[in-house]
C-alpha cells in the first residue's frame, strides 16, 4: 500500500479526533477523541519511519503509547472524581470542582 494512503488515513483520524474534542461536552468522549488523535500521530510516525527505513519513528510511537497509557490512568481517575462529586461527566462541570 502506498505510504500516502496511511498519511491520509492519519489526517482523517486526527481530524475526527479534533472535531470530537471541540464539539462534544462529555468528558469520556473528549478523552476518547484525544486518544484517537494520539493514535493518528502514532500512525504518522510509523509511516514516516517506514518511508525513511529507520526505526526512529517506531521508537517514538512506542514512547507515545507508554505516555498514553499513563494518561489513561490519570484521566480516568479525574473523570471518575468529577462523576462522583457532580453525578455528571460533563466538561462544563470541571470548573465547579473547587467548591
Curated annotation (Swiss-Prot):
> GO MF annotations for this entry?
NADH:ubiquinone reductase (non-electrogenic) activity; quinone binding
Question: Which GO cellular component term is one of those annotated?
Answer: NADH dehydrogenase complex
Task: Kindly state which reaction or reactions the protein catalyses.
Answer: a quinone + NADH + 5 H(+)(in) = a quinol + NAD(+) + 4 H(+)(out)
Q: What is its EC class?
A: translocase
Transmembrane region(s): 3-23, 28-48, 59-79
Note whether Transferase occurs among the keywords.
no
EC number(s) per entry: 7.1.1.-
**One Pfam assignment:** Oxidored_q2
Q: Which domain of life is it from?
A: Bacteria
List keywords of the entry alphabetically: Cell membrane, Membrane, NAD, Quinone, Translocase, Transmembrane, Transmembrane helix, Transport
Q: Which GO terms describe its biological process?
A: ATP synthesis coupled electron transport
Q: Which InterPro entries match?
A: NADH_UbQ_OxRdtase_chain4L/K (IPR001133), NUOK/Mnh_C1-like (IPR039428)
Its quaternary organisation is: NDH-1 is composed of 14 different subunits. Subunits NuoA, H, J, K, L, M, N constitute the membrane sector of the complex.
Q: What does this protein do?
A: NDH-1 shuttles electrons from NADH, via FMN and iron-sulfur (Fe-S) centers, to quinones in the respiratory chain. The immediate electron acceptor for the enzyme in this species is believed to be a menaquinone. Couples the redox reaction to proton translocation (for every two electrons transferred, four hydrogen ions are translocated across the cytoplasmic membrane), and thus conserves the redox energy in a proton gradient.
Q: Spell out the family assignment given in the record's similarity comment.
A: Belongs to the complex I subunit 4L family.
Protein name according to UniProt: NADH-quinone oxidoreductase subunit K
The species this protein belongs to is Frankia alni (strain DSM 45986 / CECT 9034 / ACN14a)
Amino acid at each position: 500500500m502506498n505510504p500516502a494512503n496511511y498519511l491520509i488515513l492519519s489526517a482523517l483520524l486526527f481530524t475526527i479526533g479534533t472535531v470530537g474534542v471541540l464539539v462534544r461536552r462529555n468528558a469520556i468522549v473528549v478523552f476518547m477523541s484525544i486518544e484517537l488523535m494520539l493514535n493518528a500521530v502514532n500512525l504518522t510516525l510509523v509511516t514516516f519511519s517506514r518511508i525513511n527505513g529507520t526505526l526512529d519513528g517506531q521508537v517514538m510511537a512506542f514512547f507515545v503509547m507508554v505516555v498514553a497509557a499513563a494518561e489513561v490512568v490519570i484521566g480516568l481517575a479525574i473523570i471518575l472524581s468529577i462523576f462522583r462529586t457532580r453525578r455528571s461527566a460533563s466538561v462544563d462541570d470541571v470548573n465547579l470542582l473547587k467548591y
